[in-house]
Amino acid sequence: DDPTSTFTCPGGSDYK
């Protein structure tokens, strides 16, 4: 997955 198009929620789960 491209880290530039992915962000981490405060819960710790990664979403596109």
Swiss-Prot record:
GO terms for cellular component: extracellular region. Keywords: Cell wall, Disulfide bond, Secreted. It comes from the Eukaryota. It is found in: Secreted; Secreted, Cell wall. Belongs to the thaumatin family. This is Thaumatin-like protein 1. The lineage of its organism: Eukaryota, Viridiplantae, Streptophyta, Embryophyta, Tracheophyta.
